[in-house]
Design a protein with these regions (language model features):
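Post-signal peptide N-terminal segment of mature Sec-exported envelope proteins
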Residues: 21-55
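Sec-dependent signal peptide recognition
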Residues: 2-9
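N-terminal Sec signal peptide cleavage junction
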Residues: 16-18
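Short, intrinsically disordered, charge-balanced linker/junction segments flanking boundaries
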Residues: 315, 319-324
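Acidic/histidine-rich, surface-exposed loop or edge segments in extracytoplasmic proteins
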Residues: 55-62, 250-251, 293
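Short coil-to-helix leader/linker segments, especially the first N-terminal amphipathic alpha-helix
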Residues: 63-78
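Subtilisin-like serine protease catalytic core
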Residues: 79-174, 178-182, 186-200, 205-242, ...
């Protein structure tokens, strides 16, 4: 893992499998125009932490008590006691890795109450969703063989369309449980997604609770607009994999990339770097709990965290422009 000082207020952490050589000049296009990035306002509400329903080796309190975040060996704990405001506040750390799971308690806010993750972007193409025009029939729409009712919920935002649809398949996402996106115990599901334009830009809808209807679903905007996240799970249960959306416009049609960490390494690195009160345990912090994180996914989790030179270059360019 390497930390490189790029510009004032920005640190970059790159941790992934060695990049494989790409043929020139095939450098993938960025998901959004990096020259038109707007930093989100700190006043935006932080995501609401979801109930922790994952089985763990030990309770978070015990992990903290046993020193599973060993800051003493590097003197971080002594330094912060002597200089409590030198905790990373005002610094943005770009994590170039397998992504960050924004649903992990402790990756929500900084020590000063600012949002911990102001932006999440996918430069790996692992979450790219191919979208095609789709036409509803009455109060339902068929997407890849899935009939979803409650289309009136969509028409409330956009009465005339256009409407686009795509899917995300579990099998290409690697080994379970990470690939069991909807938490039903299988890894062969194909999950439909609908995209349409609202008054404030493109939005995503998904049947997140699996009830066959979009009626109770909420629109999900590009993460940069409001730090909205979503995930699939049976009603009343917490999604196992928290996702964000990258939505951009290409000549009047939407482009969608889902951002998620199906490998866990990027989230692990993020916790070490800047977690604050992990799982609600006061003081269960990373090295710089006051810092913010820029989650830039460059590695495909299903392929063991392998990345490409093009993904790294695009992410580094985005990080510098974002912090400028």
């Amino acid at each position: 893992m390497h930390s490189i000082r790029l510009v004032s207020g920005l640190a970059l952490i790159l941790a992934c499998a060695p990049a494989r050589k790409e043929p020139e000049p095939a450098i993938p296009k960025p998901n959004i125009d990096p020259g038109r990035v707007n930093r989100p306002q700190a006043a935006l509400p932080a995501p609401t932490p979801q109930a922790d329903s994952v089985q763990r080796l030990v309770p978070p309190q015990a992990a903290y008590a046993h020193g599973w975040m060993p800051l003493a060996s590097t003197g971080v704990d002594r330094f912060l006691r002597a200089h409590p405001t030198y905790d990373g506040r005002g610094v943005l750390i770009a994590i170039l890795d397998t992504g960050i799971d924004p649903g992990v308690p402790g990756l929500n806010t900084t020590t000063t109450g600012d949002p911990k993750i102001p932006d999440l972007r996918d430069f790996s193409d692992e979450g790219a969703v191919s979208l095609q025009p789709v036409a509803p029939s009455g109060d339902s729409v068929v997407i890849a063989g899935h009939r979803l009712g409650g289309f009136g919920r969509i028409r409330a935002l956009n009465t005339a369309g256009p409407y686009y649809a795509g899917t995300i398949s579990e099998i290409p996402l690697g080994q379970p449980p990470a690939s069991d996106v909807n938490g039903n115990g299988t890894v062969g599901d194909t999950l439909p997604i609908l995209v349409t334009r609202a008054s404030d830009g493109w939005v995503l809808f998904a049947d997140t609770d699996g009830d066959g209807s979009l009626a109770g679903e909420r629109p999900v905007h590009d993460y940069l607009l409001g730090r909205e996240t979503f995930g699939w799970a049976p009603r009343g249960r917490t999604p196992k994999l928290t996702m964000a959306a990258n939505l951009s416009d290409s000549a009047g049609t939407p482009r969608l990339d889902l951002v998620f960490d199906n490998f866990g390494h990027g989230t692990h690195v993020s916790g070490i770097a800047a977690a604050h009160d992990l799982y609600g345990v006061p003081g269960f912090d990373g090295v710089a709990p006051g810092a913010q994180l820029l989650g830039l996914k460059i590695a495909k989790g299903a392929q063991g965290g392998i990345t490409t030179t093009g993904s790294i270059l695009r992410a580094m360019d985005y990080a510098v422009r974002f912090a400028a």
